Amino acid sequence: MDFGIGFISTNIMLPILDFFFGIVHSYGFAIIALTLVIRLGLYPLSAGQIRNMRKMRITQPLMKERQEEIQKRYKDDPAKQQEEMAKVMKEFGNPLAGCLPLLLQMPILFALFATLRGSPFSDINYTVDLQILPQEQVERIVPQTFSTKPQNIYVDEALHYPIAVFLPGGKMLGVGEKTQLEIQSTEGKAFNQVIPEKNSQILTPTYSVTKGEDRISVNPDGTIEALVPGDATVQVTIPGIAARTGFLFIKALGQVGVTGENGEINWDILGMIVFFGFSIYLNQELSGASGGGAPNAQAQQQQTINKITPILFSGMFLFFPLPAGVLMYIVMANVFQTIQTLILMREPLPENLQKLLDEQQKATQGRESLPFEKKSSKKKEKTS
C-alpha cells in the first residue's frame, strides 16, 4: 500500500478539498481554503524555521569569529579542535537545524501540489506501451492482462473514482490483430457507467499515438489495430471537469502557459507569475536576508543574489509551465508565508540576542562606509 505522497493526496487533501467545495461550490475558493488549512497546520514548523534563521543571522558573525579562533589555536590538534567546535555548535546552535522543519513539511506540500495538478483541475493522461509482433510469435505467448496505475478522476462535483486503463489481451499484439482499450474503475465498473449523464460529453476520453504512428492505428472509441512489427505508445486522456472553469480573473483553472495555442498572451497567468516573484522579493526583505551583522562584500553579494532569485524562480514558470490552479496555490502560499514572516520578524528577541544585535548595530554605525556599500545597508533591523 502507498503511504507516500499519493496516500496523503488521496486520504487527506482530496477529502478536505471536497469538504470545502461542498460549502462554497467553487473550486477556486476550495483551492484557497485548502491552501490556508494546510499552511495553518504547518505554521509551527515554518515558524520554527523562520525563528532559527533569524537567530543564526544574528549569531553568525560571532560564531564565525569563534570558529576561526579555534582553528588557529588548535591547528595542530584536530581532536581538540573538533571538541571545541562541538561546544560552539552547542552554544550557538547548528545552522542546519533550520532545515529540519522544511524537510518535515515537504511531503505534505508535495502532496498538495500533486493534488492540484491532478483531476479535476487538469486533464489526466495514461500511457500504454505496446509491442507489435509477427503473428507466429504471438501464438507462442500467453496473454496477460495489462493495466495502468489508477488515478483519481473527478466525474462530478466532489465525486471521484480511482480509474485505470486495461488491455485484457495484454500489451503484445500480432500484426493484423485488434484490441480494445478499456477504461474502468478499480472495482471493475466501466468508465461510462460511473459518469453522470450531464458530464458524459465533457469527460469523453481521447486517444492519440505518441510513438509508432506507422505501426498501429487507434479509433476514437479506443480500438487499436496492429499494422507492422515494432514498439508503439498510446496516450489516453481524460479531461478534468474543472480544467476549463474560470475563477475571478482566471480564465480557466487548467490553463497552462503564458501563451496560448494561437500565440495570445494569457495575462492572468503572467500576472500571477509576476506577483509570485514580487512576493519572494518582499519575503526576503521582511526576513532581513540582505541585512544583519556588519555590512561587507559578502553582504553586498547576498543582496545581489536576493534580487536575482525572484527573477529566476518566476522565469522558471516560463520554461516549466503549470496549470493556473497550481499557480494560484503557489501565490496564495507565498502570501501566507509573507504575512507569517512579517509577524514573526516583529517578535521581541531574547535578551541575549537583542544585546548581541545592538552591539553589531553600534559597530556598524561607528565606522565609515566602504566605497562599494550602499547607505541602506546600515539600516537597523526592527525587533518590535
UniProtKB/Swiss-Prot annotation:
The record lists the membrane-crossing segments as 12-32, 96-116, 311-331
Q: Does the keyword Signal apply?
A: no
The UniProt keyword set, sorted, is: Cell inner membrane, Cell membrane, Chaperone, Membrane, Protein transport, Transmembrane, Transmembrane helix, Transport
Q: Where in the cell is it found?
A: Cell inner membrane
What does the record note as the disruption phenotype of the gene behind this chain? Answer: Merodiplod cells have greatly altered thylakoid morphology, and about 40% photosynthetic pigements, photosynthetic electron transport and oxygen evolution.
GO CC, alphabetical: plasma membrane
A GO term for molecular function = membrane insertase activity
Membrane-related topology note: Multi-pass membrane protein
InterPro entries in alphabetical order: YidC/ALB3/OXA1/COX18, YidC/Oxa/ALB_C, YidC_ALB_C
Ranges for region Disordered? 357-384
Q: What is its main location?
A: membrane
Biological process GO terms, please?
protein insertion into membrane; protein transport
The subunit structure is:
Specifically interacts with transmembrane segments of nascent integral membrane proteins during membrane integration. Interacts with the precursor of PSII reaction center D1. Coimmunoprecipitates with CyanoP (tlr2075), FtsH2, FtsH3, Phb1 (slr1106), Ycf39 and Ycf48.
Q: Which family does it belong to?
A: Belongs to the OXA1/ALB3/YidC family. Type 1 subfamily.
Q: Which NCBIfam families match?
A: PRK02654.1, yidC_oxa1_cterm
Primary role:
Required for the insertion of integral membrane proteins into the membrane. Probably plays an essential role in the integration of proteins of the respiratory chain complexes. Involved in integration of membrane proteins that insert dependently and independently of the Sec translocase complex.
Protein name as annotated: Membrane protein insertase YidC
